[in-house]
Design a protein with these regions (language model features):
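Multi-pass membrane proteins that catalyze or facilitate reactions on polyprenyl-/lipid-phosphate substrates
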Residues: 1-62, 69, 73-270, 274-390
Length: 390
């Protein structure tokens, strides 16, 4: 959408739409971008097919949660920085409020038997859901598990395998590995002009509920950690899981394994972007200030990247070097997600029952197409309660 064309919708209307989508938009990133196409292109006619595809392409190219980034872009396309800001805030605010309320309940009642029973089932289901999401992301972003396709994309599969191995071995996020994979793939597949020229290339250096309970140093750590995590969300909000697990559980020790899985589950039962789990984690660590800082830090890279790229995106989108760089990073990040599933799975699948629940969750996503993640989580919670109290 160009600046000379006046949008057919008002700033209030687009803000109201994203507030509604953030409140009722269940189903994860793929479902959310589908809702936007149905509502904004097919039903309301606010966007053309070409405008929608341009926004979706930007959301897939740049780091950040897919649905939130598309929403910010659409807001920017109609009403500039103000539109992007209001659309982004409206989209994230409902789920943020929900995870803060759930965080309060979790802190107050998390030690009670019924709450532990709920998350006994939920934790296992989360493993199945994340595992299936990792499988779908692998096929979508790298290639199908077909010998010919895998041979054609062998280097991306190598980066993917490296991501799995490094994550399992180190049990934390290795940002420099992801950057190295992106740079190497760019150099091999589509080297920039300055690399092709016979000139000296400059070196690149990679460098009660506790509502108000926090300390300044913790907030600084939360801000810096979630800022880094938000900058490396490629393909799906679930790609943030390995980053969060490595830092939240291993590096800082803010949460234990079960609390971390519970945090991921909370994100799945609330509408809006999956990365809102950052707000829940922030609340558990440092109360309401922690929730605010973690959420802002996670979404800030997405917001900045979108506003920076949107004005000249058509030119950037044709740059083969940038696309190759993103492809390389994406392959290793998805590999890290698979590695995280393995690590968390070994600690969450504690008996035969939890193994069955995890398998059920994965199979439900395959064979029961209309059964969305929140319903699967709800069924798993009911099973957990039944097992513990019946």
């Amino acid at each position: 959408m160009t600046e000379t064309v006046k949008p057919t919708y008002s700033l209030f209307e687009i803000t109201k739409y994203y507030l509604k989508l953030g409140t009722w938009g269940f189903g994860g990133p793929v479902a959310l971008v589908g809702y936007m196409h149905r509502d904004l292109v097919e039903n309301k006619g606010w966007l053309t097919e070409e405008e929608y595809k341009e926004g979706l392409a930007l959301a897939q190219l740049a780091p950040g949660p897919l649905a939130a980034q598309l929403g910010i872009y659409i807001g920017f396309a109609g009403y500039g920085v103000l539109g992007a800001t209001l659309a982004g805030l409206a989209f994230v605010l409902p789920s943020f409020i929900m995870v803060v309320l759930l965080g309060m309940a979790y802190k107050l009642y998390g030690g009670l038997a019924w709450m532990q029973a709920v998350f006994y089932g939920v934790g296992a289901a989360v493993i199945g859901i994340i595992g299936m999401s990792a499988y779908k992301l692998t096929i979508k972003s790298i290639s199908k598990f077909d010998p010919a396709a895998m041979k054609a994309k062998w280097l991306l599969w190598l980066f993917y395998s490296i991501g799995i191995a490094i994550t399992i071995i180190t049990q934390k996020e290795e940002v420099l590995i992801f950057l190295a994979c992106g740079i190497l793939y760019m150099i091999i597949k589509a080297p920039p002009r300055w690399i092709k020229k016979p000139a000296i290339v400059p070196a690149v250096i990679l460098i009660g509920s506790g509502f108000w309970r926090y300390d300044g140093k913790t907030l600084e750590n939360i801000a810096w950690f979630f800022l880094k995590a938000g900058a490396f969300v490629f393909g799906s909000g679930l790609a943030i899981v390995p980053f969060l697990h490595g830092g939240v559980v291993k590096e800082f020790g803010w949460l234990n394994e079960h609390q971390f899985v519970d945090a991921v589950a909370v994100a799945m039962i609330t509408p809006g972007p999956v990365v809102i789990t950052a707000g829940f984690i922030g609340y558990l660590v440092a109360g309401f200030p922690g929730a605010c800082v973690a959420t802002v830090a996670t979404f800030l890279p997405c917001y900045i990247f979108t506003l920076s790229l949107a004005p000249s995106f058509k030119k950037i989108a044709k740059n083969a070097s940038i696309k190759a760089f993103v492809d390389g990073i994406t392959a290793s990040v998805i590999g890290a997600l698979v590695g995280s599933v393995v690590i968390i799975g070994f600690r969450s699948i504690i008996d035969f029952t939890t193994a069955v629940i995890a398998v059920f969750a994965a199979l439900a996503l395959i064979y029961l197409k209309k059964l969305q993640e929140p319903y699967i989580i709800g069924i798993a919670a009911a099973i957990g309660l039944a097992i513990k109290f019946l």
